[in-house]
């Protein structure tokens, strides 16, 4: 069973803005990443009854491991 997840953007003033609803956590995380790449900012995925299940931290920098 796929759940429906809401994607929100955290605004600079601390408020939240609902963006969209998508089906499935994988799709929600993917969409959240695309939104952040296009418009920047902090986003999170919310599942009713569970709360925030994923967040995108704009200050996180991916570092590739060097072998």
For each predicted feature, which ranges?
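General helical structural elements
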Residues: 13-14, 33-35, 67
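Surface-exposed loop/edge segments in extracytoplasmic proteins
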Residues: 14-20, 52-54
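A short, charged, amphipathic alpha-helix used as a generic interaction element across diverse proteins
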Residues: 22-46
């Amino acid at each position: 069973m796929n759940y429906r997840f809401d994607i929100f953007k955290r605004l600079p003033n601390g408020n939240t803005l609902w963006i969209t609803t998508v089906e499935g956590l994988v799709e929600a995380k993917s969409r959240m990443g695309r939104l952040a790449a296009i418009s920047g900012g902090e986003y999170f995925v919310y599942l009713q009854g569970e709360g925030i299940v994923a967040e995108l931290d704009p200050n996180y920098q991916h570092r590739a491991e060097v072998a």
